[in-house]
Amino acid sequence: MKRAWQRMLSGRRLDLLDPTPMDIEIEDIAHGLAFVARWNGQTTGDYAYSVAEHSLLVEELFARANPGIGERWRLAALLHDAPEYVLGDMITPVKAAIGKGYVELDDRLTAAVHLRFGLPAVLPAPIKRAIKAADTVSARLEAEQIAGFSEAEADRIFGKPDPVLVRGLAIRLRPPPEVRAAFTARHHVLLRSLSG
């Protein structure tokens, strides 16, 4: 069999087919996500809109949509796309075309990431749905603000967002090192709140 692992900047060797929580480091995740572009890089601005930046927005939207939700589930929202630090961010039509193989890889990596940071390997269905709802609102904002969709087209594909939910939010484009630091800092805040 060919090599199925990747050497991470932390020095860890992550087996992509059989990942273990011991091989997951937040610095590797933050670095990878800060350099992975959403929308295949087809966005306006001087910097690609990164998966790390998107994840920060999803966590904020999730918290706004679910007042009083615990930090544990906010951490899950922040990490909702964590496997993309090694798999990359494929747009939805490509994921659908690839099918089951991609889903299985994503599920294995997700479980390892969750276990590494004290979350259940598989999230409860209501939490998963609530995170997906925040993810969809984020995609809607991104589509219109930076990905070239008209308002009507974005509404048709992603739905019209609740104006109260998105009030004051704007898509941020930052250099990868800056968003990497922001993602890592947010992760540390959420993780610290879980440990008391």
Curated annotation (Swiss-Prot):
Superkingdom of origin:
Bacteria
Under the heading SUPFAM superfamilies, the entry gives:
HD-domain/PDEase-like (SSF109604)
List, alphabetically, the PROSITE patterns matched.
HD
UniProt domain HD: residue ranges: 51-164
Give the matching Pfam families: HD
Q: Which Gene3D superfamilies match?
A: Hypothetical protein af1432
Q: Which InterPro entries match?
A: HD/PDEase_dom, HD_domain
- Locate the transmembrane regions by residue number: none
Protein name as catalogued: Uncharacterized protein RCAP_rcc00048
